[in-house]
Amino acid sequence: MNFRVVFLTVFLSVPFCCCQNVTELSGTSPNGSSLSGTNQNSEPQKGVINAGSTPSSGTLSIASLQAMLATLMMTNKQTVAAASKPTVTNTGSKQPTATGQPTLSQPRKQLILTNRRRNPRRWGRVFIDNKSNLCAFERQNFLNSFGLHDKLKKDIVENLNKIRKDVKAQNMNCLLWSEKLAAKAAKLVKECTYQNTNKAAITSMVYEKEIGDQLVGRSLSRWMDNKKYFSYGNDCRDTGGCQFSQIVWARSKIIGCAAERCSDMTNMVCLFEPKGNVRNELPYLTGNQCAQCSASRGSTPTCNKDKLCEWYFPRPKF
């Protein structure tokens, strides 16, 4: 805009200067007397305008030029004033400028995804630039925690608690889900190997290309097959016996699992805490159910409807 103002000012100043010097070029002094060395009767030279003559077509008068310059300067002031005003956006976020004065600007457009329960504290948030492919990929991993969605997690906990209930032990704890253990299991499951050297973990490798609802049923079937290797009162020695022993280990309270696709199979690993298969310890105490429920300091043990030990922390008194 400044370039156009300068260009028009220079362009319009040329005829204005010529009009001011007309008296000098026409051979007439400002007081009306003839200049020395000039012929008053001679015809004006080509390209020279007489002072008293009427402007020909295409020639601007001084008053017209002054009016145009005034209009141009007024337009320039209005444009500069409009550009200096802050632009209000929908978000209203402020960003400091180089002069230190906050100005309003529009931030990068973002898409916020939350899970179906819309609990950002648990699941966090994902900011995605407007790319449909990336959005679909992030949504799949966002809703599935460590390869397992909420229904599969619930099925794992419920079915393992059914196995623990059928044992009829005095001190059998009810298992609860732990996302912290699931994160640890996610590191092990990526190895895509069926060899399990961790006696506090259970694994399963099933022929299933996609992680679906049948994963839990097939895994439980494999784990129950290992019951034939279990011997109460004896330390587990093989992988099969140790896996079932860990499932019915009474002191274990929390579980976390993760699944990973490995070629045409699916591998799943579950970790328990407190860890089971401790040497020279019994997996559980036989007898009346819930007869010897234990709990952490400050919590109260209870017996639920499935005859499994539960515990809770009382609400603080204010």
UniProtKB/Swiss-Prot annotation:
Disordered, as annotated region: 27-55, 83-105
GO cellular component terms, A-Z: extracellular region
Comp. bias (Polar residues): 27-44
Tissues showing expression: Component of the acid-insoluble and acid-soluble organic matrix of calcified layers of the shell (at protein level).
Positions annotated as glycosylated: N21, N31, N130
Chief site of localization: secreted
Chain segments annotated as transmembrane: none
UniProt keyword Zinc, yes or no: no
Localization per record: Secreted
Keyword Ribonucleoprotein assigned: no
Family annotation (InterPro entries): CAP_dom, CAP_sf, CRISP-related
Signal peptide extent: 1-19
Limits of the SCP domain: 158-272
Keywords, alphabetical: Glycoprotein, Secreted, Signal
Stored SUPFAM superfamilies: PR-1-like
Protein name: SCP domain-containing protein 2
Gene source species: Lottia gigantea (Giant owl limpet)
Species lineage: Eukaryota, Metazoa, Spiralia, Lophotrochozoa, Mollusca
